[in-house]
Amino acid sequence: MERGIIGAIIGDVVGSRFEWENNRSTDFEFLTDVSKFTDDTVMTCAVADWLVNNDNLAEELRTWARKYPKAGYGGKFREWAFDKEVLPPYNSFGNGSAMRVSPVGFYATTFGEAMELAKQSAEVTHNHPEGIKGAQATACAIFLARAGRSKKEIKQEIEYWFGYDLDRKIDDIRTVYKFDASCQGSVPEAIIAFLESEDYESAIRLAISIGGDSDTIACITGGIASAFYGVPDELVEKVWKYLKEDVKYSIHVFNCICDSRVISGDMEAFGFEPNFDDAYEDDEWFDEDSEMSEEELKDLMDEIEEYEENRN
């Protein structure tokens, strides 16, 4: 079994052919000749490289977007990514912030770090509170799964911190769901698909059966399911053939960095009360009792950058 961002990427690849031709069933061929990676994968690699290299995130996103200009970006993001200058964030609450955030969940060593890095990963484009919230909920679900929390505990934590309604059932959602690319209209559904699943593959099948923005919903679900179950090696091997060399390299380097980081599942070490109605301050998600201060986080990122330079 393999755990990591490959789980999110597989969700994107499997869901790619259903984005505009929804399949409201869990019974479908998992991978076909027309399956491909999309903007979800490209942006996931950009965030992974940002975490590894401690680079400017806006430049990472723009660089990766320009490598793959036809990956299927939304209109506002395309305008932002391909402009000659780095434009300010455009107050989006679209699920683009959640689709690219899985590396944060696998990289973070504390719940608070997951919160802060998810916020940073979103706000360069998706600085609307719901856009930030969707990224944080996804990253924190992944972190909690990595920390060994049960599905019940993950559900309770996400409901508590983010206020999502996770009591619905996929069968009920499926009958009424319409295409919704907002965080608030797709992230809760993706999490519910994970909560109802039995293993990694069933999680992806449930996510796609919802309909709507299938590749992104499956990408979000896939990241969480990968952290919780792991991904079967044979499935990783199959999907590997759909990926370009730079995508594979990004995944490999990111995995090497994450393997050296020790996770802490101590929620009590990070006591804070989120308020998504208020403006975000740079240090809002850090308090004096947290396990990792902003300065310590910066020092850690500097160490990782030095490690990567020596490695090359």
Task: Show the residue positions of the predicted features.
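Structured, active/binding-site neighborhoods that engage oxygen-rich ligands
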Residues: 1-312
